Curated annotation (Swiss-Prot):
Its EC number is 2.7.11.32, 2.7.4.27. One of its GO terms (molecular function) is ATP binding. It catalyses: N(tele)-phospho-L-histidyl/L-threonyl-[pyruvate, phosphate dikinase] + ADP = N(tele)-phospho-L-histidyl/O-phospho-L-threonyl-[pyruvate, phosphate dikinase] + AMP + H(+); N(tele)-phospho-L-histidyl/O-phospho-L-threonyl-[pyruvate, phosphate dikinase] + phosphate + H(+) = N(tele)-phospho-L-histidyl/L-threonyl-[pyruvate, phosphate dikinase] + diphosphate. It comes from Oceanobacillus iheyensis (strain DSM 14371 / CIP 107618 / JCM 11309 / KCTC 3954 / HTE831). The lineage of its organism: Bacteria, Bacillati, Bacillota, Bacilli, Bacillales. ADP binds at G150, V151, S152, R153, T154, S155, K156, T157. Keywords: Kinase, Nucleotide-binding, Serine/threonine-protein kinase, Transferase. Belongs to the pyruvate, phosphate/water dikinase regulatory protein family. PDRP subfamily. PANTHER family: PYRUVATE, PHOSPHATE DIKINASE REGULATORY PROTEIN 1, CHLOROPLASTIC. It comes from the Bacteria. It holds the Pfam family Kinase-PPPase. Bifunctional serine/threonine kinase and phosphorylase involved in the regulation of the pyruvate, phosphate dikinase (PPDK) by catalyzing its phosphorylation/dephosphorylation. It is an enzyme of class 2 (transferase). This is Putative pyruvate, phosphate dikinase regulatory protein.
Length: 271
């Protein structure tokens, strides 16, 4: 019989959660020569039998995270029969939650890792929105899930960030009469592009407030009505050329516009 203690970690997923718990426990024991053997994707009694038999012949503990109640019960009963120390790492927690919440658990393996995947997708989308904000790099247009286009102060950046938190990669492109829009904008699927329209009066008010916030006079060309109308006419010519959908953001909060965009995306994906 081996004298080095072994902790077998059985899991119906990758086993990372169980291993972390075991390591946390081991950290309380100084100078221990312990071995952890992770056994992922356990789905049948044969695998359970194999490692319980190994544990019986060594100085071992079997720790397990299994969501299937039948398999959990089997491990516990067989371990007791073979006099193997077995620890149900997640079962008692799920059972207690079910009792207190009066709800039935989903009993799906690997959900923690699905949540982790969602988290990293969100971070990736946020980084994407920053990198391809305000037309900084037109290469992002082809890679984006959604491309927002509009004149200055139509909430392109806050919308990009809001949608990024929904794990959607957004590039945004400013429309300025003196600058031709990037060629990439004319090459993507028009369904991915969304124009942000605003009334001249509303834009004039927003830009004046912006100039005041910067400590500048509100008579600058940036807030001039003739200039604004010129920009909006140019914007309209661009969205007409692309053939994309347009949302009027004049009196909409960012959240309201974002939800409208999400609905459009869902409709387009279902076509």
């Amino acid at each position: 019989m081996s004298t080095q203690p072994i902790i077998y970690v059985l899991s119906d997923s990758v086993g990372e959660t169980a291993e972390l718990v075991v390591k946390a426990g081991l950290s309380q024991f100084k100078n221990g020569d312990y071995k952890i053997q992770r056994v992922p994707y356990v789905e049948d009694k044969e695998t359970v039998d194999e490692f319980l038999a190994l544990a019986k012949d060594t100085v071992s503990i079997v720790g397990f995270t299994l969501v299937d109640p039948e398999l959990r019960a089997y491990v516990n009963s067989q371990a007791k029969k073979l006099e193997v120390e077995a620890i149900d790492i997640m079962g008692p927690t799920m059972d207690a939650m079910g009792r207190v919440f009066n709800r039935t658990p989903r009993l799906e393996a690997g959900l923690v890792h699905k949540l982790d995947e969602d988290y990293f997708k969100k971070i990736e989308a946020i980084e994407f929105a920053v990198k391809y904000d305000d037309g900084r790099d037109p290469r992002g247009i082809a890679r984006a899930d959604i491309i927002l286009i509009g004149v200055s102060r139509t909430s392109k950046t806050p919308l990009s960030q809001y949608l990024a938190h929904k794990r959607i990669k957004v590039a945004n492109v400013p429309i300025v009469p003196e600058v031709d829009p990037p060629e990439e904008l004319m090459m993507v699927d028009p369904k991915k592009c969304i124009g942000l329209k605003i009334t001249a009066e509303k834009l004039n008010s927003i830009r004046k407030e912006r100039l005041k916030a910067l400590g500048l006079g509100d008579q600058a060309t940036y807030a001039n009505m003739n200039r604004i109308e010129q920009e909006l006419e140019y914007f309209q010519s661009i969205v007409d050329k692309i053939g994309c959908q347009v949302i009027d953001v004049s009196n909409k909060a960012v959240e309201e516009t974002a939800n409208h965009i999400l609905r459009l995306k869902q409709e387009n994906n279902s076509l």
